[in-house]
């Protein structure tokens, strides 16, 4: 009857959204950096269909657990691309402030730009990070010698650092530098590491064990029978298929079903 009375009325839109199966880093909001808090987007939350983010306070770190080809390494590259975008925006703000002749605005813009971290990456030749876009990492360290190399590099670091460590369960720490970072000895350095759940779990005295205690991270394509205890409990049944890049992000200790962002551009999907 209503359709007959109002034939030109648009059809009612479906109020139930659908979690996308792929999300580009380009569609994510800007990463935010301050001395006390970093907010780095990770993907789209199933419950809200809005972007969600890791929140890392001073001295905090995150872990992304998943099996090979689950999408965990790709997420590290996406993080790096978000930081690169933030740096470019900060540099543009400085240039605009200088061009305006406003000395106060220029100084404030410089201070904001100084809060954007450098991105250092630790990986080996088997890692998906070898295919990252050129220039996305400010420094690269080979997994085998990373402990000593990162320790030396930190002596020259002039500002904050986002340290991305792929397959952290295979990265030893003879110099105890990663352990020192996790304990808060370098408050301007935040680690986001990846690892395979079955390899992370038995590492009781490894530096990755301490990162998991922060309860910020993600479990990608989790096995509900074996991965329930990585950061906290997760639902045994998901409302959607847990395909590549899907899993549970732990935000402030609570699990959120997400589609993680991809490091690929919208126009070049499949290139990484």
Roles of regions detected by a PLM:
Residues 32-213:
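P-loop NTPase catalytic phosphate-binding loop
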Residues 1-46, 51-52, 202-272:
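Phosphate-binding and hydrolysis-coupling loops of NTP-dependent motor/remodeling domains
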């Amino acid at each position: 009857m209503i359709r007959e009375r109002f034939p030109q009325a648009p059809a009612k839109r479906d109020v139930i959204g659908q979690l996308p199966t792929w999300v580009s880093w380009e569609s994510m909001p800007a990463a935010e950096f301050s001395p006390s808090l970093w907010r780095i987007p990770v993907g789209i939350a199933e419950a809200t269909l809005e972007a969600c983010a890791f929140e890392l306070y001073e001295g905090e770190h995150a872990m992304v657990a998943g099996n090979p080809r689950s999408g965990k390494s790709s997420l590290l590259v996406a993080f790096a691309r978000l930081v690169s975008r933030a740096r470019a925006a900060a540099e543009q703000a400085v240039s605009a402030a200088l061009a305006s002749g406003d000395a106060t605005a220029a100084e404030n813009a410089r201070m904001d730009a100084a809060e954007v971290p450098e991105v250092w990456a630790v990986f080996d030749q088997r890692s998906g990070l070898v295919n990252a876009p050129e220039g996305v990492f400010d420094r690269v360290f080979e997994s085998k010698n990373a402990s000593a190399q990162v320790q030396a590099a930190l002596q020259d670091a002039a500002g904050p650092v986002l340290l991305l460590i792929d397959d952290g369960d295979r990265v030893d720490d003879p110099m105890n530098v990663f352990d020192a970072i996790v304990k808060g000895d370098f408050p301007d350095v935040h680690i986001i590491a990846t690892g395979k759940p079955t390899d992370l779990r038995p590492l009781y005295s490894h530096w990755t064990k301490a990162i998991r205690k922060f309860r910020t991270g993600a479990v990608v394509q989790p096995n509900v029978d074996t991965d329930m205890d990585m950061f906290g409990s997760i639902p045994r049944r998901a409302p959607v298929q847990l395909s590549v890049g899907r899993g549970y992000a732990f935000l402030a200790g609570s699990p959120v079903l997400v589609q993680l962002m991809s490091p690929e551009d919208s126009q070049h999907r499949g290139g990484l």
